[in-house]
């Protein structure tokens, strides 16, 4: 009945209006590793009851749309995307991931066509924007400047770039 999860979400929603659910991917499936395994390579993907959990949470909160942002980064398959879309949860777009020179990169601002997402300059797993910028190869910096005219204040330029995307939230 997801009692532990429901209590945890209930408490969080007493503190905040919206949650970013880290590792949302695990609500579709997770990598199970036997406790006796010597490394994580020996695991298998296992389907998880995320859909049932999200339905239970919606019922408990009595809402049409859950106030959750899905961290849909990493190994994301169609099942994860479908789960996020089935519950109208916004996903995440990270500008620091955008500028690898691939014109089809889904994080490139011009390729953010879905508005049900949140654009971030980076995440808690990344360096700060200025540290990220300072550590970049000059070729990548040139590629970024092709996509946006960065001023001396890189952080603000990326914020402005993110705010110009079609994303609902920044």
What is each residue range found by the language model?
Residues 1-169:
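Alpha-amylase-like alpha-glycosidases and glucanotransferases acting on alpha-linked glucans and related
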């Amino acid at each position: 009945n997801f009692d532990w999860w429901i209590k945890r979400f209930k408490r969080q929603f007493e503190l905040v209006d919206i949650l970013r659910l880290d590792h949302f991917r695990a609500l579709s499936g997770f990598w199970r590793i036997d406790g006796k395994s010597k490394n994580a390579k020996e695991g298998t993907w296992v389907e998880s009851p995320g859909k049932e959990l999200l339905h239970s949470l919606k019922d408990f909160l009595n809402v049409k749309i859950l106030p959750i942002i899905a961290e849909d980064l990493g190994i994301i398959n169609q099942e994860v995307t479908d789960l996020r879309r089935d519950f109208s949860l916004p996903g995440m777009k990270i500008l620091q991931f955008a500028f690898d020179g691939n014109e089809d990169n889904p994080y490139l601002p011009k390729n953010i066509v879905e508005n049900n997402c949140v654009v971030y300059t980076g995440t808690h797993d990344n360096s700060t924007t200025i540290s990220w910028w300072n550590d970049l190869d000059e070729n990548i910096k040139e590629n970024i400047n092709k996509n946006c005219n960065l001023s001396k204040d890189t952080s603000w330029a990326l914020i402005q770039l993110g705010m110009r995307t079609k994303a609902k939230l920044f």
